[in-house]
């Protein structure tokens, strides 16, 4: 008989997904899944990339959903109170929490461990890069570069606007014999894409040991030997400079990192910063320019922004 678990559903906005995921990771959550309507709309517009699409998902096109999975124990009510209060307080940090509704349901272990996989199919995210889950088959076209990925439930599937913009920027700016640093590497998707696009050496860093483990596993799936994954922050665990530093995080962290990051970029190198909500674009640009970066280009997709700046 399948074990029963408690599923906490938070109905929110795309803007608040990362913040709410962070709230859940501060509790005893055993798994997190994300349903982002922006990803769903993207997949509907690119039907050739999918061999399965559940039209019922479009019924929640204005609502993003974060689900956390818990064992039923003495601490659950404490976790639930913390989640509700933290979600309620997001407005104080300038984050649109959307509906902000929190619900609890009982589910079987099988339901949450594997069902999410059926919605995750190979997706072309740039001119060359196709993100392919490791359990799917895909007929590669001649010019395509395949990134094999098992994101697990803790990380995005690589189709979010912020990730797509980063990959497209890497595709444009990476040249042979270049070094790339990936800050907050998560599943390793940007590090892997950078290596497959021709970077000579890639270093990915993340403070989360789960991310470090996930990145290393995904690198093995792609048979790459020129990527190094380190646990910690860039300033403490990495030596040397890169031609490109990429960070797909959030605006406040990018602003905080900007001065330190400058010392890790070669003259003439680029800082690709994404994960920035449109309302924070000018704040990030201002900080970059104050620090000596020259804005090369600003890309926008939906409510998200990717800023590419340069050290001259």
Swiss-Prot record:
Keywords: Cytoplasm, Methyltransferase, S-adenosyl-L-methionine, Transferase. One of its GO terms (biological process) is methylation. It is found in: Cytoplasm. Its EC number is 2.1.1.-. S-adenosyl-L-methionine binds at residues 163, 184, 206, 248. One of its GO terms (cellular component) is cytoplasm. It catalyses: L-lysyl-[protein] + 3 S-adenosyl-L-methionine = N(6),N(6),N(6)-trimethyl-L-lysyl-[protein] + 3 S-adenosyl-L-homocysteine + 3 H(+). This is Ribosomal protein L11 methyltransferase. GO terms for molecular function: protein-lysine N-methyltransferase activity. Belongs to the methyltransferase superfamily. PrmA family. Methylates ribosomal protein L11. SUPFAM superfamilies: S-adenosyl-L-methionine-dependent methyltransferases. HAMAP family: Methyltr_PrmA. Its main location: cytoplasm. It comes from Clostridium botulinum (strain Loch Maree / Type A3).
